[in-house]
Amino acid sequence: MIIKPIASPARYFLRTPSWSAVAIFQAVKIKPLQLRTNSSNSVTPNLISPSKKSWKDLFSKRWQYYAEISRAGSPTGTYLLYSPCTWSILMAAYAYDSSLVNVTKMLALFGVGSFLMRSAGCVINDLWDRELDAKVERSKSRPLASGKLSVRQAISLLSVQLTASLGILLQLNPYTIKLGVASLVPVCIYPAMKRITYYPQVVLGLTFGYGAVMGWPALAGEACMNWSVVAPLYLSTISWIVLYDTIYAHQDKRDDVKANIYSTALRFGDNTKPVLCGLAALQIATLATAGIMNGQGPVFYTLGVAGAAYRLSSMIYKVDLDDPKDCFRWFKRNSNTGYLVAAAIALDWLAKSFIYDS
Protein backbone atom coordinates (compact mmCIF):
# COMPACT_ATOMS: atom_id res chain seq x y z
CA MET A 1 0.00 0.00 0.00
CA ILE A 2 1.30 3.40 -1.01
CA ILE A 3 0.91 6.17 1.58
CA LYS A 4 0.64 9.64 0.12
CA PRO A 5 2.34 12.40 2.14
CA ILE A 6 0.12 15.10 3.59
CA ALA A 7 0.72 18.37 1.77
CA SER A 8 0.41 20.47 4.92
CA PRO A 9 -0.11 19.33 8.54
CA ALA A 10 -2.08 22.48 9.29
CA ARG A 11 -4.36 21.84 6.28
CA TYR A 12 -4.94 18.29 7.52
CA PHE A 13 -5.99 19.40 10.98
CA LEU A 14 -8.21 22.14 9.63
CA ARG A 15 -10.01 19.55 7.46
CA THR A 16 -10.62 17.48 10.60
CA PRO A 17 -13.90 18.51 12.31
CA SER A 18 -12.49 18.18 15.84
CA TRP A 19 -9.49 20.40 15.00
CA SER A 20 -10.83 23.78 14.10
CA ALA A 21 -8.49 26.78 14.10
CA VAL A 22 -9.93 27.91 17.43
CA ALA A 23 -9.41 24.47 18.95
CA ILE A 24 -5.77 24.42 17.87
CA PHE A 25 -5.12 27.84 19.42
CA GLN A 26 -6.82 26.78 22.65
CA ALA A 27 -5.01 23.45 22.78
CA VAL A 28 -1.50 24.87 22.54
CA LYS A 29 -2.39 28.21 24.19
CA ILE A 30 -1.27 30.35 21.28
CA LYS A 31 -2.77 33.78 20.86
CA PRO A 32 -3.43 34.98 17.33
CA LEU A 33 -0.67 37.24 16.04
CA GLN A 34 -1.64 40.87 16.51
CA LEU A 35 -0.87 43.34 13.80
CA ARG A 36 -0.09 47.01 14.11
CA THR A 37 0.70 49.77 11.72
CA ASN A 38 3.94 51.70 11.85
CA SER A 39 4.56 55.27 10.81
CA SER A 40 4.67 54.26 7.14
CA ASN A 41 1.18 52.67 7.42
CA SER A 42 2.56 49.21 6.68
CA VAL A 43 1.34 46.30 8.76
CA THR A 44 3.99 44.66 10.94
CA PRO A 45 3.76 41.89 13.53
CA ASN A 46 3.51 43.13 17.12
CA LEU A 47 6.20 40.80 18.40
CA ILE A 48 7.17 40.82 22.08
CA SER A 49 10.47 42.62 22.53
CA PRO A 50 12.85 41.48 25.25
CA SER A 51 12.73 43.56 28.42
CA LYS A 52 15.39 46.23 28.62
CA LYS A 53 18.08 45.76 31.23
CA SER A 54 19.60 48.64 33.15
CA TRP A 55 23.22 48.90 34.25
CA LYS A 56 22.12 47.79 37.73
CA ASP A 57 21.29 44.32 36.39
CA LEU A 58 25.00 43.72 35.82
CA PHE A 59 25.54 43.53 39.58
CA SER A 60 24.24 41.35 42.38
CA LYS A 61 21.37 42.53 44.55
CA ARG A 62 23.71 43.43 47.42
CA TRP A 63 25.82 45.68 45.19
CA GLN A 64 22.65 47.26 43.87
CA TYR A 65 21.65 48.07 47.45
CA TYR A 66 25.12 49.51 48.13
CA ALA A 67 24.69 51.77 45.11
CA GLU A 68 21.19 52.73 46.24
CA ILE A 69 22.20 53.69 49.78
CA SER A 70 25.08 55.73 48.30
CA ARG A 71 22.63 57.47 45.92
CA ALA A 72 24.88 56.50 43.00
CA GLY A 73 21.94 56.82 40.63
CA SER A 74 20.98 60.29 41.89
CA PRO A 75 23.96 62.57 41.15
CA THR A 76 22.21 65.87 41.93
CA GLY A 77 23.52 65.87 45.50
CA THR A 78 27.08 65.37 44.28
CA TYR A 79 26.74 68.27 41.84
CA LEU A 80 25.40 70.53 44.60
CA LEU A 81 28.22 69.56 46.97
CA TYR A 82 30.80 70.10 44.23
CA SER A 83 29.59 73.56 43.17
CA PRO A 84 30.97 75.57 46.15
CA CYS A 85 34.31 73.79 45.68
CA THR A 86 34.51 74.93 42.06
CA TRP A 87 33.55 78.50 42.95
CA SER A 88 36.31 78.74 45.54
CA ILE A 89 38.99 77.08 43.41
CA LEU A 90 38.22 79.22 40.37
CA MET A 91 38.13 82.43 42.41
CA ALA A 92 41.56 81.58 43.81
CA ALA A 93 42.76 80.89 40.27
CA TYR A 94 41.46 84.31 39.23
CA ALA A 95 43.22 86.02 42.13
CA TYR A 96 46.61 84.36 41.73
CA ASP A 97 46.72 83.58 37.99
CA SER A 98 47.16 79.87 38.71
CA SER A 99 48.20 77.48 35.97
CA LEU A 100 45.54 75.52 34.13
CA VAL A 101 47.24 72.26 35.14
CA ASN A 102 47.00 73.00 38.87
CA VAL A 103 43.41 74.22 38.59
CA THR A 104 42.37 71.13 36.62
CA LYS A 105 44.07 68.88 39.17
CA MET A 106 42.24 70.51 42.07
CA LEU A 107 38.90 70.42 40.28
CA ALA A 108 39.39 66.70 39.60
CA LEU A 109 40.38 65.89 43.20
CA PHE A 110 37.45 67.82 44.62
CA GLY A 111 35.13 66.20 42.09
CA VAL A 112 36.05 62.70 43.21
CA GLY A 113 36.05 63.80 46.84
CA SER A 114 32.57 65.30 46.46
CA PHE A 115 31.22 62.03 45.10
CA LEU A 116 32.78 59.99 47.90
CA MET A 117 31.81 62.32 50.74
CA ARG A 118 28.28 62.81 49.46
CA SER A 119 27.90 59.02 49.28
CA ALA A 120 29.34 58.63 52.78
CA GLY A 121 27.03 61.36 54.06
CA CYS A 122 24.03 59.52 52.65
CA VAL A 123 25.06 56.32 54.43
CA ILE A 124 25.55 58.22 57.71
CA ASN A 125 22.16 59.86 57.25
CA ASP A 126 20.45 56.54 56.57
CA LEU A 127 22.10 54.93 59.60
CA TRP A 128 20.75 57.70 61.81
CA ASP A 129 17.32 57.78 60.15
CA ARG A 130 16.57 54.14 59.41
CA GLU A 131 13.62 54.09 61.85
CA LEU A 132 12.32 57.50 60.77
CA ASP A 133 12.70 56.65 57.07
CA ALA A 134 10.38 53.69 57.54
CA LYS A 135 7.60 56.14 58.47
CA VAL A 136 8.04 58.39 55.42
CA GLU A 137 6.53 57.35 52.10
CA ARG A 138 9.42 58.61 49.95
CA SER A 139 12.15 56.95 52.01
CA LYS A 140 10.58 53.77 53.39
CA SER A 141 12.05 51.64 50.58
CA ARG A 142 15.64 52.69 51.26
CA PRO A 143 17.95 49.70 51.89
CA LEU A 144 18.32 50.19 55.66
CA ALA A 145 14.74 51.24 56.34
CA SER A 146 13.38 48.27 54.38
CA GLY A 147 15.88 45.76 55.77
CA LYS A 148 17.58 45.06 52.45
CA LEU A 149 20.92 45.90 54.07
CA SER A 150 22.00 45.37 57.65
CA VAL A 151 23.60 48.02 59.85
CA ARG A 152 26.84 46.06 59.76
CA GLN A 153 26.89 46.04 55.96
CA ALA A 154 26.21 49.79 55.85
CA ILE A 155 29.04 50.50 58.31
CA SER A 156 31.40 48.36 56.22
CA LEU A 157 30.50 50.36 53.12
CA LEU A 158 30.94 53.61 55.05
CA SER A 159 34.42 52.53 56.13
CA VAL A 160 35.44 51.98 52.52
CA GLN A 161 34.02 55.36 51.47
CA LEU A 162 35.74 57.27 54.27
CA THR A 163 39.04 55.50 53.59
CA ALA A 164 38.86 56.46 49.92
CA SER A 165 37.92 60.03 50.90
CA LEU A 166 40.94 60.18 53.20
CA GLY A 167 43.11 59.12 50.28
CA ILE A 168 41.84 62.10 48.29
CA LEU A 169 42.25 64.48 51.25
CA LEU A 170 45.88 63.45 51.75
CA GLN A 171 46.68 64.74 48.26
CA LEU A 172 46.11 68.30 49.55
CA ASN A 173 48.33 70.58 51.64
CA PRO A 174 48.40 70.23 55.47
CA TYR A 175 46.23 73.30 56.12
CA THR A 176 43.46 72.05 53.83
CA ILE A 177 43.71 68.59 55.38
CA LYS A 178 42.97 70.12 58.79
CA LEU A 179 39.98 71.95 57.35
CA GLY A 180 38.75 68.72 55.78
CA VAL A 181 38.95 66.79 59.04
CA ALA A 182 37.00 69.57 60.78
CA SER A 183 34.22 69.21 58.20
CA LEU A 184 33.38 65.75 59.57
CA VAL A 185 31.76 67.35 62.62
CA PRO A 186 28.74 68.87 60.79
CA VAL A 187 28.60 65.82 58.50
CA CYS A 188 28.06 63.51 61.46
CA ILE A 189 25.71 65.69 63.51
CA TYR A 190 23.42 66.83 60.68
CA PRO A 191 21.08 63.79 60.81
CA ALA A 192 20.48 64.39 64.53
CA MET A 193 19.45 68.00 63.98
CA LYS A 194 16.12 67.11 62.38
CA ARG A 195 15.14 65.55 65.72
CA ILE A 196 15.84 68.61 67.88
CA THR A 197 15.50 71.76 65.77
CA TYR A 198 13.40 73.20 62.97
CA TYR A 199 16.61 74.38 61.29
CA PRO A 200 18.54 71.26 60.21
CA GLN A 201 18.92 72.90 56.79
CA VAL A 202 21.29 75.45 58.36
CA VAL A 203 23.56 72.63 59.56
CA LEU A 204 23.33 71.08 56.10
CA GLY A 205 24.39 74.46 54.68
CA LEU A 206 27.46 74.49 56.93
CA THR A 207 28.26 70.98 55.69
CA PHE A 208 27.49 71.19 51.98
CA GLY A 209 28.97 74.67 51.61
CA TYR A 210 32.27 73.77 53.26
CA GLY A 211 33.93 73.30 49.90
CA ALA A 212 33.95 77.09 49.62
CA VAL A 213 36.33 77.16 52.59
CA MET A 214 38.56 74.31 51.40
CA GLY A 215 38.87 75.09 47.69
CA TRP A 216 40.78 78.37 48.01
CA PRO A 217 43.65 77.17 50.26
CA ALA A 218 43.84 73.85 48.40
CA LEU A 219 44.92 75.78 45.30
CA ALA A 220 46.63 78.86 46.75
CA GLY A 221 48.01 77.56 50.05
CA GLU A 222 47.57 78.65 53.66
CA ALA A 223 49.68 81.79 53.27
CA CYS A 224 47.33 83.08 50.57
CA MET A 225 44.10 82.32 52.41
CA ASN A 226 41.90 85.39 51.90
CA TRP A 227 39.00 85.35 54.35
CA SER A 228 37.63 88.61 52.96
CA VAL A 229 36.66 86.58 49.87
CA VAL A 230 36.13 83.14 51.37
CA ALA A 231 33.86 84.23 54.25
CA PRO A 232 31.18 85.94 52.10
CA LEU A 233 31.47 83.14 49.56
CA TYR A 234 30.81 80.58 52.30
CA LEU A 235 27.83 82.59 53.57
CA SER A 236 26.52 82.74 50.00
CA THR A 237 26.64 78.96 49.66
CA ILE A 238 24.98 78.46 53.06
CA SER A 239 22.10 80.76 52.07
CA TRP A 240 21.71 78.95 48.76
CA ILE A 241 21.70 75.50 50.39
CA VAL A 242 19.12 76.47 53.02
CA LEU A 243 16.99 77.87 50.19
CA TYR A 244 16.97 74.82 47.93
CA ASP A 245 16.83 72.28 50.77
CA THR A 246 13.80 74.04 52.24
CA ILE A 247 12.08 73.46 48.90
CA TYR A 248 13.28 69.84 49.02
CA ALA A 249 11.87 69.44 52.56
CA HIS A 250 8.41 70.48 51.39
CA GLN A 251 8.16 67.09 49.64
CA ASP A 252 7.85 65.29 52.96
CA LYS A 253 6.15 67.86 55.18
CA ARG A 254 2.99 65.79 55.72
CA ASP A 255 4.91 62.63 56.62
CA ASP A 256 7.40 64.63 58.71
CA VAL A 257 4.61 65.86 60.98
CA LYS A 258 3.55 62.26 61.66
CA ALA A 259 7.14 61.10 62.21
CA ASN A 260 8.11 64.07 64.44
CA ILE A 261 10.80 65.22 62.01
CA TYR A 262 11.62 68.93 62.04
CA SER A 263 12.53 71.09 59.06
CA THR A 264 12.48 74.67 57.83
CA ALA A 265 9.57 73.67 55.59
CA LEU A 266 7.46 73.09 58.70
CA ARG A 267 8.88 76.10 60.51
CA PHE A 268 8.18 78.58 57.72
CA GLY A 269 4.91 76.98 56.55
CA ASP A 270 2.81 79.41 54.51
CA ASN A 271 5.53 82.05 54.86
CA THR A 272 8.09 79.93 53.05
CA LYS A 273 8.20 81.93 49.82
CA PRO A 274 8.88 85.30 51.51
CA VAL A 275 11.67 83.64 53.51
CA LEU A 276 13.07 82.10 50.32
CA CYS A 277 13.15 85.56 48.77
CA GLY A 278 15.19 86.79 51.72
CA LEU A 279 17.60 83.86 51.41
CA ALA A 280 17.98 84.49 47.68
CA ALA A 281 18.73 88.17 48.31
CA LEU A 282 21.34 87.21 50.91
CA GLN A 283 22.94 84.70 48.59
CA ILE A 284 23.21 87.13 45.69
CA ALA A 285 24.47 89.97 47.91
CA THR A 286 27.20 87.85 49.51
CA LEU A 287 28.18 86.31 46.17
CA ALA A 288 28.60 89.81 44.74
CA THR A 289 30.56 90.84 47.85
CA ALA A 290 32.96 87.93 47.36
CA GLY A 291 33.42 89.03 43.75
CA ILE A 292 34.10 92.63 44.75
CA MET A 293 36.67 91.58 47.36
CA ASN A 294 38.35 89.36 44.76
CA GLY A 295 38.35 92.03 42.04
CA GLN A 296 36.21 89.97 39.66
CA GLY A 297 35.44 91.41 36.24
CA PRO A 298 32.17 92.13 34.39
CA VAL A 299 31.68 88.57 33.13
CA PHE A 300 31.28 87.35 36.70
CA TYR A 301 28.57 89.89 37.52
CA THR A 302 26.61 89.74 34.28
CA LEU A 303 26.61 85.96 33.88
CA GLY A 304 27.17 84.64 37.39
CA VAL A 305 25.52 87.08 39.78
CA ALA A 306 22.71 88.30 37.51
CA GLY A 307 22.18 84.82 36.07
CA ALA A 308 21.89 83.24 39.50
CA ALA A 309 19.52 86.00 40.64
CA TYR A 310 17.24 85.35 37.67
CA ARG A 311 17.22 81.58 38.18
CA LEU A 312 16.50 81.83 41.90
CA SER A 313 13.70 84.37 41.51
CA SER A 314 12.13 82.29 38.74
CA MET A 315 12.29 79.15 40.89
CA ILE A 316 10.74 80.83 43.93
CA TYR A 317 7.93 82.29 41.84
CA LYS A 318 7.08 79.09 39.95
CA VAL A 319 7.58 76.26 42.45
CA ASP A 320 4.43 74.70 43.88
CA LEU A 321 5.37 73.92 47.48
CA ASP A 322 2.33 71.66 47.88
CA ASP A 323 3.34 69.42 44.97
CA PRO A 324 6.16 67.01 45.96
CA LYS A 325 7.09 66.27 42.34
CA ASP A 326 7.34 69.96 41.50
CA CYS A 327 9.47 70.59 44.59
CA PHE A 328 11.87 67.84 43.56
CA ARG A 329 12.00 69.09 39.97
CA TRP A 330 12.99 72.61 41.04
CA PHE A 331 15.41 71.28 43.64
CA LYS A 332 17.30 69.38 40.94
CA ARG A 333 17.54 72.48 38.77
CA ASN A 334 19.76 74.14 41.35
CA SER A 335 22.69 72.12 40.04
CA ASN A 336 22.43 74.18 36.84
CA THR A 337 22.64 77.35 38.92
CA GLY A 338 25.86 76.02 40.41
CA TYR A 339 27.25 75.31 36.94
CA LEU A 340 26.30 78.79 35.79
CA VAL A 341 28.20 80.54 38.58
CA ALA A 342 31.23 78.27 38.08
CA ALA A 343 31.20 78.94 34.33
CA ALA A 344 30.98 82.69 34.97
CA ILE A 345 34.05 82.62 37.25
CA ALA A 346 35.97 80.46 34.77
CA LEU A 347 35.13 82.72 31.82
CA ASP A 348 36.02 85.77 33.90
CA TRP A 349 39.37 84.17 34.67
CA LEU A 350 39.99 83.58 30.96
CA ALA A 351 38.90 87.12 30.15
CA LYS A 352 41.35 88.45 32.72
CA SER A 353 44.17 86.44 31.16
CA PHE A 354 43.48 87.40 27.55
CA ILE A 355 41.49 90.65 27.66
CA TYR A 356 41.61 92.56 30.94
CA ASP A 357 45.41 92.32 31.34
CA SER A 358 46.28 92.68 27.66
From Swiss-Prot:
One of its GO terms (cellular component) is mitochondrial inner membrane. It comes from the Eukaryota. The chain crosses the membrane at residues 76-96, 107-127, 154-174, 202-222, 229-249, 275-295, 336-356. Pathway: Cofactor biosynthesis; ubiquinone biosynthesis. It is a multi-pass membrane protein. GO terms for biological process: isoprenoid biosynthetic process; ubiquinone biosynthetic process. It catalyses: an all-trans-polyprenyl diphosphate + 4-hydroxybenzoate = a 4-hydroxy-3-(all-trans-polyprenyl)benzoate + diphosphate. Its EC number is 2.5.1.39. It is found in: Mitochondrion; Mitochondrion inner membrane. It is an enzyme of class 2 (transferase). Keywords: Isoprene biosynthesis, Membrane, Mitochondrion, Mitochondrion inner membrane, Transferase, Transit peptide, Transmembrane, Transmembrane helix, Ubiquinone biosynthesis. InterPro entries: HB_polyprenyltransferase-like, Prenyltransferase, UbiA_prenyltransferase, UbiA_prenylTrfase_CS, UbiA_sf. Residues 1-20 form a transit peptide. Gene3D superfamilies: UbiA prenyltransferase (1.10.357.140). Its main location: mitochondrion. One of its GO terms (molecular function) is 4-hydroxybenzoate polyprenyltransferase activity. Its cofactor is Mg(2+). It holds the Pfam family UbiA. Catalyzes the prenylation of para-hydroxybenzoate (PHB) with an all-trans polyprenyl group. Mediates the second step in the final reaction sequence of coenzyme Q (CoQ) biosynthesis, which is the condensation of the polyisoprenoid side chain with PHB, generating the first membrane-bound Q intermediate. Belongs to the UbiA prenyltransferase family. This is 4-hydroxybenzoate polyprenyltransferase, mitochondrial. The gene is ppt1.
